[in-house]
């Protein structure tokens, strides 16, 4: 074969390979296309942790995580009820994503570097932290009063190896009483054995909504951690879509849906997004 013929043959082969590449790329469809074709979203979450994901009196799944899934379903189909929930343990959150058992997981999952190597996190939908709850008619008005009281203050907290260090990060001189259940830490405050309860801000907010006027937030939070949904790595179209749905729920056309959920589960009214220049780009 002459040089010119070999060159022509190579050129033809290269052209055939290049022409086939777009078709091959089109075959690798996004999870977005799969979900749209199926007609409903499949979301992994739990069922035993109020106010995030738990059963109502009539056995319906509800909570803030559940509502985040409904936001995505509404963005997909115009209907927040076009969603199937897969009940899963915390340990199953990542495996169920990587094995395609679910399209997405929203289950008060803390964003960490280690987890981000295994799955793709969406934009955050909540910032958790530790807070302090007081009795409304108690002797301490707020966090400043607690801190000023020094060693006179007793704080009830759920028993764990980090409990002392966690409380002392905010109240260095406080006495720390550890209990085996969440119910007991609240009972300690109610009975007067403790002056304050230290636990997740979301748990305190939920408890206060269930007991209006009886308790109050001390006005200080620490130990921040970010909650985000998780999807499978390597599918930018799907990640972009979910991020868009969550972003617009927190800042745009679906804000009322997000704000209503926030009020229901945390008892707080959110300020509507500022009109004009998008604040997230300042």
Indicate where each model-derived feature is located:
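Ligand-binding cleft/hinge of the Venus flytrap
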Residues: 55-58, 70-81, 147-149, 163-178, ...
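Beta->alpha turn/N-cap motifs
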Residues: 45-49, 86-91, 100-112, 136, ...
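Extracytoplasmic small-molecule ligand-binding "clamshell" domains
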Residues: 26-105, 117, 150
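Short helix-initiation/N-cap motifs at beta->coil->alpha
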Residues: 30, 83-95, 141, 159, ...
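A ligand-binding cleft/hinge motif common to bilobed small-molecule-binding domains
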Residues: 92, 108-118, 168-169, 188-224
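Extended ligand-binding regions for polar small-molecule ligands
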Residues: 67-75, 152-153, 161, 226-269
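Flexible hinge/capping segments at coil-to-helix
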Residues: 123, 135-154
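Periplasmic-binding protein-like
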Residues: 47, 126-137, 201-246, 265-282
């Amino acid at each position: 074969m002459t040089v010119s013929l070999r060159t022509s043959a190579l050129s033809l082969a290269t052209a055939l390979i290049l022409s086939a590449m777009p078709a091959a790329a089109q075959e690798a469809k996004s999870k977005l296309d799969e979900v749209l074709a199926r007609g409903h979203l499949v979301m992994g979450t739990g069922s035993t942790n109020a106010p995030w994901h738990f059963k109502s009196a009539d056995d319906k799944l509800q909570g803030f995580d559940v509502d985040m899934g409904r936001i995505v379903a509404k963005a997909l189909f115009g209907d927040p009820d076009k969603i199937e929930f897969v009940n899963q343990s915390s340990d199953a959150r990542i495996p169920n994503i990587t094995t395609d058992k679910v399209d997405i997981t929203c289950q008060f999952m803390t964003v960490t570097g280690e987890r981000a190597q295994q799955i793709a996190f969406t934009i955050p939908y909540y910032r958790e932290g530790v807070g302090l709850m007081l009795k409304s008619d108690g002797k301490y008005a707020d966090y400043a009063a607690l801190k000023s009281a020094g060693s006179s203050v007793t704080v009830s907290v759920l028993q764990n190896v980090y409990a002392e260090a966690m409380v002392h990060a905010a109240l260095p001189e406080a006495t720390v009483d550890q209990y085996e259940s969440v119910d007991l830490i609240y009972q300690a405050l109610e009975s007067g054995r403790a002056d304050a309860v230290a636990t997740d801000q979301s748990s305190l907010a939920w408890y206060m909504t269930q007991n209006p006027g009886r308790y109050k937030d001390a006005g200080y939070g620490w130990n921040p951690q970010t909650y985000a949904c998780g999807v499978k790595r390597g599918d930018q179209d799907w990640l972009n879509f979910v991020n868009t749905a969550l972003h617009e729920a927190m800042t745009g056309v679906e804000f009322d849906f997000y704000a209503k959920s926030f009020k229901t589960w945390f008892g707080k009214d959110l300020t509507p997004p500022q009109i004009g220049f998008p604040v997230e780009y300042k």
